[in-house]
Every structure is written in C-alpha cells, then in structure tokens.
Amino acid sequence: MGAGNTKLSKEEINELIKKTNYTKDQIDKLSKDYNEYSSKDKKSGFTESEFIDFFYCRFRDWDKDLLIQLFKLFDTDCNGILDFKEFVTSLYIMTKAPVVEKLSLLFDLFDKDQSGHLEVDEVEKLIGVAVACGTSLGMDYSGVTNYVFSICSAENMSNKKKGMNKEEFIKAASNSDKFCKMICFYDSMGQMLY
C-alpha cells in the first residue's frame, strides 16, 4: 500500500471498520487524504517528515523528537513508512479510541527508554507537553498544571524510585478524558476525521 495505492480488499475494509468504528465513507475519505499527503515525495506511504507535516496542526506544541517517537510507535512494521492501515489506526487512536487505549499509547510514547516506568525526566517531558497543549487549547495554566501534577504525583506510584508504571498512569489519568484532550488526543469536531 502507499501513495496512489490504498486499494484494500473487502475483508480488509471490514476489518478497519470493525477496529476503528469509521464508516466505509470515512475510510474512503481517509484514503483520498492519505494518497494526497503521502505522495508529496513520490515515495510509497507516509514518511516520517510527511507524518510530522500532516499532524503539525494538531500537535504544534509538541517538539519534533516527540513527533518522531509517535511516528515510530505507529510504524508497526518498522519500515520507516506508514502504510494506509497504520495511518488509519493512528488516526483512530488519536481521536476515537477509548481513553484507556489512548493513555496506553501515551505512556509508551513518553517511556522513551522503554523501562516500563516513567522516570523523572520522562514525567517532566509529559508535564511540559500537557501544560503547553492544555494552555494552547484555552485551559487555565494553573488548573492544567495542578491537574497534570495530580496524575503524576508520587501518591500514584507504588515504587517511587522506579517511577510510575503503565497501570498506575492509566489508573490515575483515566477518570475522565480530560488528560487525553489536554495532550491533543481528542475526538475531532463535527464531520472532521482528524
């Protein structure tokens, strides 16, 4: 799959519909957008730079390294290109997925060393991104800061030396979808798909 070639079998389309809750018409729209944006460099699929350009409007408060890490998480076959299924799945996780799925991905994104725990520097990065995104969305700075600190506080960690594990992070942040919205993982408005 890739630029100009997002033809999926009926079974693959049905699988995407079931997995993502997108309709057939939405899958068709995503296919058109994928073909348009992924063909800029004449390579097959979404490259890292095309991914960053495409998602910059949503993640303008994220630094480039974090966007590269996000790309790598979605590039499940590790070939440096997002094929159409990976692209649709990435949009689903960022917009329509249940809060727990979004939080699981966010944990993996910020657990840069893949230790299974968010250490101090990783938590600081998470807090910085959440505060920047939240305030750019019009949320009160002190309210955003206090909320994020309450999620990442030592009270929510069973092993304060190692840091917060994935289960603890999800439990602390999943009381509502507020944290996901703050970090720009929110369902799009109206008819927009991303």
UniProtKB/Swiss-Prot annotation:
Origin: domain of life: Eukaryota
Keyword flag Thylakoid: no
Binding site for Ca(2+) 1: 75, 77, 79, 86
A biological-process GO annotation: calcium-mediated signaling
Keyword Repeat: yes
GO molecular function: calcium ion binding; kinase binding
Gene3D superfamilies documented for this protein: EF-hand
InterPro entries registered for this protein in UniProt: CNBL1-10, EF-hand-dom_pair, EF_Hand_1_Ca_BS, EF_hand_dom
Record's keyword terms, sorted: Calcium, Metal-binding, Repeat
Domain EF-hand per the UniProt entry, residue ranges: 62-97, 98-133
Binding site for Ca(2+) 2: 111, 113, 115, 117, 122
PANTHER family to which the protein is assigned, alphabetical: CALCINEURIN B, CALMODULIN
Family from the record: Belongs to the recoverin family.
UniProt name for this protein: Calcium-binding protein J
